[in-house]
Curated annotation (Swiss-Prot):
<keyword id="KW-0443">Lipid metabolism</keyword>
<dbReference type="GO" id="GO:0047952">
    <property type="term" value="F:glycerol-3-phosphate dehydrogenase [NAD(P)+] activity"/>
</dbReference>
<feature type="binding site">
    <location>
        <position position="18"/>
    </location>
    <ligand>
        <name>NADPH</name>
    </ligand>
</feature>
<keyword id="KW-0594">Phospholipid biosynthesis</keyword>
<dbReference type="GO" id="GO:0051287">
    <property type="term" value="F:NAD binding"/>
</dbReference>
<dbReference type="InterPro" id="IPR006168">
    <property type="entry name" value="G3P_DH_NAD-dep"/>
</dbReference>
<keyword id="KW-0547">Nucleotide-binding</keyword>
<dbReference type="InterPro" id="IPR008927">
    <property type="entry name" value="6-PGluconate_DH-like_C_sf"/>
</dbReference>
<keyword id="KW-0963">Cytoplasm</keyword>
<feature type="binding site">
    <location>
        <position position="40"/>
    </location>
    <ligand>
        <name>NADPH</name>
    </ligand>
</feature>
<comment type="function">
    <text>Catalyzes the reduction of the glycolytic intermediate dihydroxyacetone phosphate (DHAP) to sn-glycerol 3-phosphate (G3P), the key precursor for phospholipid synthesis.</text>
</comment>
<feature type="binding site">
    <location>
        <position position="263"/>
    </location>
    <ligand>
        <name>sn-glycerol 3-phosphate</name>
    </ligand>
</feature>
<dbReference type="GO" id="GO:0005829">
    <property type="term" value="C:cytosol"/>
</dbReference>
<dbReference type="GO" id="GO:0008654">
    <property type="term" value="P:phospholipid biosynthetic process"/>
</dbReference>
<dbReference type="GO" id="GO:0046167">
    <property type="term" value="P:glycerol-3-phosphate biosynthetic process"/>
</dbReference>
<feature type="binding site">
    <location>
        <position position="39"/>
    </location>
    <ligand>
        <name>NADPH</name>
    </ligand>
</feature>
<feature type="binding site">
    <location>
        <position position="251"/>
    </location>
    <ligand>
        <name>sn-glycerol 3-phosphate</name>
    </ligand>
</feature>
């Protein structure tokens, strides 16, 4: 039985992609009434009538307590928890449209795993800047959370990070379902960096797999990838312990190893010799988050003087035209050093 500290709350999940739709189901299964916002009215109508999201989560039936709308004002009205399921590079412009519709004391929960291009801001910083919300009102949900597995009710755990521990506990209580176990912490920086950087490492693992490399290579990329994520985190003031937890190693392993991972799958196509454009076409026009984040994180690391060789290699493949063979040689030919 799930322990509850607060009463059930009203939740708005803004974004009907695979993860947003899944979390709407989780919040509903936890006993809450949920507003799920879809950008396209045609998709909202389809979900309302069929109780299924055929575009992003086919085969999963949503509870009747998930109310679907394409009207942002209706979705946000009076909700005490607002879950932002918007891609990282679209978050700023979308929030400009919504900021006056959000309740002044609502807890804002970010799902986006990325670093904003050009500004190099984390998503919680973008939310605070655009909405004017105090950082203590902004939480981050991150962990080894492959959407379809969770939507199917397979057991999983996640992290709710917020500067205000009580707000983190409020979200924890609201999203805890029999198959979904949330933990809390107050390290927003580390939680966000783990989520953003793992997409880049997952691209590297996918590239290696597509190139024909085996499990030794995959394990090496994951462990050395974690090391460089932790170095960046330390330089930015994160708690090093975060990277050994669900938002660090947990998310990294799931994303780097599963064929359900969009970033790993995208990288696999690059490793097999497809161009970025070919890989994009094969994934219905979607660019993996790690492709964009590789540039932001690379620039961030250079600015802070942090060594991130795997990120540098992925950046070179995605943005500078480096061949995969060159990427492998560059990583293996680096100067020798202690672990």
């Amino acid at each position: 039985m799930i322990e509850r500290v607060w009463q059930l709350v009203s939740v708005a999940v803004m974004g009907a992609g695979s993860w947003g739709t899944t979390l709407a189901k989780v919040f509903a299964d936890a006993g809450n009434t949920v507003q799920l916002w879809a950008r396209r009215e045609s998709l909202a109508e389809t979900i309302r009538t069929s109780r299924e999201n055929p575009d992003y989560l086919p085969g999963i039936t949503l509870p009747d307590s998930v109310i679907v709308t394409s009207d942002a004002q209706a979705a946000l009205d009076g909700c005490s928890i607002v879950v932002l399921g918007i891609p990282s590079q679209a978050l700023r412009t979308t929030l400009v449209e919504w900021r006056d519709l959000i309740s002044p004391d609502a807890t804002l929960v970010s799902l986006a795993k990325g670093i904003e291009k050009d500004t190099h801001l984390r998503m919680s910083q973008v939310i605070a800047e655009v909405t004017g919300a105090d950082p203590s009102r902004i939480a981050v949900l991150s962990g080894p959370n492959l959407a379809r597995e969770i939507a199917e009710g397979q057991p999983a755990a996640t992290v709710i990070a917020c500067e205000d521990e009580n707000r983190a506990k409020l979200v924890q209580a609201a999203v805890a379902a029999p198959y979904f176990r949330p933990y809390t912490n107050t390290d927003v920086i580390g939680t966000e960096l783990g989520g953003a950087c793992k997409n880049v490492i997952a691209l590297a693992c996918g590239i290696a797999h597509g190139f024909g490399l085996g499990e030794n290579s995959n394990a090496s990329l994951i462990t050395r990838g974690l090391a460089e994520i932790a170095r960046l985190g330390e330089a930015m003031g994160a708690d090093p312990r975060t990277f050994a937890g669900l938002a660090g190693m947990g998310d990294l392993v799931a994303t780097c190893s599963s064929p359900l991972s969009r970033n790993r799958t995208f990288g696999d196509r690059l490793g097999r010799g497809e161009s970025l454009e070919q890989a994009r076409e094969a994934t219905h026009g979607q660019v993996a988050e790690g492709v964009i984040s590789s540039q932001s994180i690379h620039d961030l690391a250079v600015g802070l003087g942090v060594e991130m060789p795997i990120t540098q290699a992925v950046y070179a493949v995605c943005h500078q035209g480096m061949a995969v063979r060159e990427m492998v040689d560059a990583l293996m030919g680096r100067s020798k050093k202690a672990e």
